Amino acid sequence: MESKIYKMELAGRELSFEIGKYALLANGAVLARYGDTAVLVTACASEKPREGINFFPLTVDYEERLYSVGKIPGGFIKREGKPSEKAILSARLIDRPIRPLFPKDFYHDVSVIATVLSVDPDNPPDVLAMLGSSVALSISDIPFEGPTGSVLVGYVDDKIVINPTAKEREVSKLHLVVSGTKDRVMMIEAGAKEVSEDIMLEAIMRAQEEIKKIVEFIEGIVREVGKPKMEYQKRIVPEDIKQKVREIAYDKVYQYVQIPDKIERDKKLDELKEEVFKAFEGETEETLLLVDDALYSLEKEIVRKMIAEEGKRPDGRKFDEIRPLYAEIGILPRTHGSALFKRGYTQVLTVATLGTKGEMQFLDGLEEEEAKRYMHHYNFPPFSTGESKPVRGPGRREIGHGALAERALEPVIPSEDEFPYTIRLVSEVLTSNGSTSQASVCGSTLALMDAGVPIKAPVAGISIGLITKDDGSFILLTDIQGIEDFFGDMDFKVAGTREGITAIQLDIKIHGLTKEIIEKALYQAREARLKILDFMQTVIDKPRSELSPYAPKIFKTTVDPEKIRDIIGPGGKMINKIIAETNVKIDIEPDGRIFVAAPDDISGNRAISMIEGIGREIEVGQFFLGKVTRTASYGAFVEIYPGKEGLVHISQLDERRLKSVDEVVKVGDLVLVKVIGIDKLGRLSLSRKEALNVTYSRKAK
């Protein structure tokens, strides 16, 4: 094929797709450019279907190349390793809008690989990779019912902005990625600073307008260079198998799916599956796969028909009803904050840990190096679904759900000036029956409040499901459980405060959503969210006023940046002396802010006093927390900061007359003293007696 470049304008910048020049053996390949960002996207499919499976084997990889931003990988091995968390999240962004657009009976392995070649900060490569994947699949011979378009949406100065620049993204109240076909929305991923439902809907529909232009542009490319779609062997269940499965299972499935209790319901359905397979004993593996397909289709048909035509949900709830809620806080005594949140069978334990500034996570990827002081991790162990299998590291799903919960709470996390701690949340899914990510949002809010983190507002999350009918009408289901998620058309996760939305994640199994569905889902989610927030505030209505006694105590001071060198000392001598004497951790910022993490108030105040004393002009009347270094018959010598001592005469040690210095102090004691005199040689006269009634507390709030 002859190389050709197709161009269009998008948000005032040129978007181009170059086809026929790169990756010539791939089924479809395109070099996508937007500004100075360039991503090569390829799509390949196996020649034959994979044997013995009943799922679509699609894999999507997002390959970050550090040369794209002029960097050499750090560490001993100077090449890229396993995908970063950002790369995994980007791969999920590409996957989710395209997966529903492949034929349901297509079992060939399909691989989509997006390789980032050049990055312009104003034009994020992940959204460009989404566009490239749509083009690569659409022009290939792989069966794909696209194309799709994707855009990033911001909300800056009360205006919706399509594909905002890096500066605009910094001040935007919204980070929204929307993907869709010409007339329907396929995927939504959003983080927001308490944005209203009206603004969110407007932003989504504004995105859809741009997506329509992109899709029409790609359709034009496909008409010119698109390959004919490959013929593939369709796996069709014969009517006799369908009929036999129906005769055995219909009445029992209808009865069992209405059992409210998940454990009992799953047990009965598993027994029924064994009964059905027993009726086909001796058949080939291929036939048994068809039997499995027939049983799945029957269960799906019955559950959807029961909801759509009879108005019944499997557990008997109304369409807008939330499962029973339960929550408990402070259940792990040695952690800094903990909460158990339950919604029906779904059960999540979240633990909050407070750390020092030095425990922040440093990210060095395609973007500028970034320090993360708040993070959320989500674990989904096999026992949560009652399965017996090895425990592996976090998969893409865990990373995606953790990022969603992290994004949901980020707008309410206090600033570093308000709360100078690093915050880590870990959500352990103990029992899964749908909507575990949103349960982790609720549990995280409670754990933060239990830990005494002054969050700006509580956050709750809910999942809305969808059942569409043949006539185009639809039913929305609040708080979907596992069986409704499995057989339904949508999982629309919405998290937020009473004021607005903080995060959205939409996954669908059909060919897109209309404006009407999205609008109703947003408002139904809001109604449920407010009910959950009401419940959560009966458990704890505001953050605890005090931190856990096991949390580090953070003290903060600010010094002249020019004094930092003196505080560190030659070869770190001075700062190491402070650390050794007070048993603290010290983090120094270039702007002069100094954070001290201490095991107790005395150590923290002592360290702050020592730091502030270095290079400071001492004046009569100032107070210091010092350490007794030696004693004599006439008084005690007190070091008020490293290298600076003063004498507390025996007459200044106490209000009463003393016979011996040892009656009040001994070497190693910390004492609060006041400077009462400085002689011509700079020697200090100190008084403990005048400082006795002074409360010394410099603990950072």
Swiss-Prot record:
GO terms for molecular function: 3'-5'-RNA exonuclease activity; magnesium ion binding; polyribonucleotide nucleotidyltransferase activity; RNA binding. GO terms for cellular component: cytosol. It catalyses: RNA(n+1) + phosphate = RNA(n) + a ribonucleoside 5'-diphosphate. Keywords: Cytoplasm, Magnesium, Metal-binding, Nucleotidyltransferase, RNA-binding, Transferase. InterPro entries: ExoRNase_PH_dom1, ExoRNase_PH_dom2, ExoRNase_PH_dom2_sf, KH_dom, KH_dom_type_1, KH_dom_type_1_sf, NA-bd_OB-fold, PNPase. Residues 621-689 form the S1 motif domain. Disulfide bonds: none annotated. One of its GO terms (biological process) is mRNA catabolic process. Mg(2+) binds at D485, D491. The keyword Disulfide bond does not apply. Its cofactor is Mg(2+). Pfam families: KH_1, PNPase, RNase_PH, RNase_PH_C, S1. Residues 552-611 form the KH domain. Its EC number is 2.7.7.8. This is Polyribonucleotide nucleotidyltransferase. It comes from Caldicellulosiruptor bescii (strain ATCC BAA-1888 / DSM 6725 / KCTC 15123 / Z-1320). The gene is pnp.
